[in-house]
Amino acid sequence: MLHGWYGDTKQMIRIGTSTIPSAYILPEILPAFGKTNPNVYFSMNQSDSQKVIDGLLQGIFDIGFTGMPSDHELLECIPFYEDRMVIITPVNEHFLHYRAEKTPDLAAIMHEPVILREKGSGSKKSADSFIESLGMSEDDLNVMARINDQESIKNLVAGGLGISIISEKAAQNLQRENKILVFQLPEHTSHRQFYIVYHKDYIYRDYMKSFIEYVKQYYQS
């Protein structure tokens, strides 16, 4: 059995999280949980999904949030939030022409200069699945950059460097500001899950158990 040590009065939860949960999901969940659990505080570290999983196995984190599942025998991996992947492009006459089409040619759009996430991220795996569904591989793409920061990707797309495939939730703010165009992917390739990940054999304290259950139920309708 694994057991974490904490000071007598500190109710700390060490969280490892991938990019999307860190930027767009946990900012909703943590304040809501904190309202009824004011003595709990969080130490949060952001990296890609694989590093979060590695950190859990190394005892660095108590709880992880990832954009891809883990099948490791020591970890429990529970989906708690569903998102969609979308293509984002600059707002210009060229891409507005695609937008005017009743059914935009996504394969043609993917031949435009593209910005990709680094390997190890759940977003990269989801993007790869869509690209494969088009009968394409990464070798067929005109890759302009590989970047791990979602906000940087969005700003570079808005600035005209290229297109990208990102989380719909992450795209919403710049879409509302008319700084990017968003193209929906086919249903069978667009959906992705986010997961709360934790040790099966960890002796969790009650406030940690409460947080895990709170997250599981937060987006349940």
PLM regions and their residue ranges:
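A late-sequence structural motif
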Residues: 25, 181-221
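Central regulatory/effector-binding core of bacterial HTH transcription factors
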Residues: 10-73
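Flexible hinge/capping segments at coil-to-helix
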Residues: 6-7, 77-115
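Short, well-ordered beta-strand segments
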Residues: 12-16, 64, 88, 115, ...
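Secondary-structure junction motif
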Residues: 104, 113-135, 205-206, 212
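Alpha-helical linker/hinge and terminal dimerization helices associated
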Residues: 1-6, 211
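Short beta-strand->loop
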Residues: 76-86, 142, 171, 176-190
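Hydrophobic hinge/microswitch elements
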Residues: 48-53, 57-61, 66, 129-181
